[in-house]
Swiss-Prot record:
SUPFAM superfamilies tied to this protein: lambda repressor-like DNA-binding domains (SSF47413)
Ranges of the DNA-binding region feature: 31-50
Organism: Rhodospirillum rubrum
Domain of life, source organism: Bacteria
Name of this protein: Uncharacterized transcriptional regulator in ATPase CF(0) region
Gene3D superfamilies: lambda repressor-like DNA-binding domains
GO molecular function: DNA binding
Pfam families: HTH_3
Family matches, as InterPro entries: Cro/C1-type_HTH (IPR001387), Lambda_DNA-bd_dom_sf (IPR010982)
Segments forming domain HTH cro/C1-type: 20-74
Keywords: DNA-binding, Transcription, Transcription regulation
Amino acid sequence: MPESDTRTIHHVDAHVGQRVRQRRTALILDQETLARRIGVSFQQIQKYERGRNRISASRLYDIAKALAVPIDYFFSDLERGDPRHDGLWPRTWGAWPKAGAPRPIRCA
């Protein structure tokens, strides 16, 4: 049995794929047209939209450009604080030091 048939589809992959499909259909584009714009087959677009294949960061960038949306469009409807999101919205961010902030020096 092929690996793609046995793996569980991650809910974030399914969500991103659904958002790709929503935007593509809102622009009245077929899968073949989007595929040509980003240099893949229409079958690959089908797999992305169904969440069967994960979309790499560079490919998601290409899709966002082709669909004229910012990258965060694909993640905008994920609920914050949902533990299934593997720490995408950690509650502890406020407790972390800001990048570049001076840290106290401890003397022994």
